[in-house]
């Protein structure tokens, strides 16, 4: 009986240790306080849990975004999060602007590895940068695809933007110097009212972000910044190298997102969350399933 009891105790210890080891397989994913970041963080977590035995803890909507996530990554409190090349280069590494998107990605990846031992994984595909947009039908009727096209016809149109866009050198003054814009009129419009203004025909062109969810609702065309005036804000997973060393399978799993998300797809997903109030978790799941990734 004593021998049997000892065997049971030994087996209990083995199972308990196995349970502890399994519980230790965990990563922490952070997101910024915006729909896009919530959605991508969910995609990352769902892929990890679907293709490995690693558990995921989410720290969502971290106030201050990069300014608070970066130190938490350095402290090992967060393992990974979705970030933008322009933000990493200009805000974290504090370097001078690089206009070429491919060069920017290569340099920001090198800078993060050298400075923080963080790895930038492959790009998701979309670029959430500053943009100029106009009604799709109007753009097509006038053959406007690029900023240069718009500049050539700008005397016919009215631009709507928030006040500080007209004051910043990396805003309207810089665009005028680069492209030669000469709009018929420029209007100061509150940042939250720009889409309503263009929808009502009060303005013809607005500044915005290229993956804004409302672009879909108002059927606006994001014009191509053909001289690359605005920096690229291409998105990718940033992960601690220590985490990859511990769970090397994560790189292949997370890179399933590489090149999978277009600007238009990200716009639509943002719209579902911001306008239709769908849960980011559900939006992420439906997208991954549509791509055959789950």
Predicted stretch roles:
Residues 16-19:
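C-terminal motif of bacterial Sec signal peptides marking the signal peptidase cleavage site
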Residues 23-37, 54-61, 155-161:
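Short, well-ordered beta-strand elements
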Residues 35, 57-71, 163, 184-196:
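Short helix-initiation/N-cap motifs at beta->coil->alpha
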Residues 47, 67-78, 173-178, 191-206:
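Short helices/loops that flank or line small-molecule/ion binding pockets
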Residues 50-61, 155-158, 176-189:
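A local structural motif
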Residues 92-121, 202, 214-228:
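Ligand-binding "clamshell"
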Residues 104-158, 259-263:
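A conserved helix-loop-strand patch within extracytoplasmic ligand-binding domains
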Residues 129-140, 234-247:
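A bilobed periplasmic-binding-protein/Venus flytrap-type ligand-binding module shared by bacterial periplasmic
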